[in-house]
Amino acid sequence: MTKAGLHRSILQELVKNGEIYRFGRGLYVRSSAWEDDFYLLQRKYGRGIYSHDTALYLLGYSDRTPAKYTMTFPKGYNALSLKQENLTVKRVVPENYDFGTIEIEFPSGNPIRVYDLERTLCDILRGSGSDVQVVGEAMKRYAASKDKNIHKLMKCADQLRVKPKVLRYMEVLP
């Protein structure tokens, strides 16, 4: 904030008056503003990328609002405050971290980094813990979508080593 020409004492006064509140280190939010948790968490944890069930929701392939957001970080990233958040934390090897990252605009107008649909489908098939019904519905929607990119899905499945699982799902879908 000092870079923006705002002195710390002014920030403290605004917090004291209830006009803003501190969300995290260097992050302040107007008390009257709509709180965009997705954006704020990503600003707080800049290395986090929304993934798994949360990415499905953000991309419009799941109707279930996640009870806990899922973010993926590179292996070795260790922010102690992550444990205090309502987050499921996933870690991946550095060579797979940026693979399939896109930026979408949230309804609030804020940019959100999320894994693309093909990467997300592979991630949820790869791990455990995803609701079978959510996975099945997402795969059905993908198979019926005019925007599906099977070549990209298979390339992603190869890189993340889930090609047999992806093929099994794709074989049984119309």
Give, region by region, the residue ranges found by the protein language model.
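A short acidic, leucine-rich amphipathic alpha-helix
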Residues: 1-2, 55
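Nucleic-acid-binding surface
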Residues: 15, 23, 27-174
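Short amphipathic alpha-helical interaction segments
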Residues: 3-16
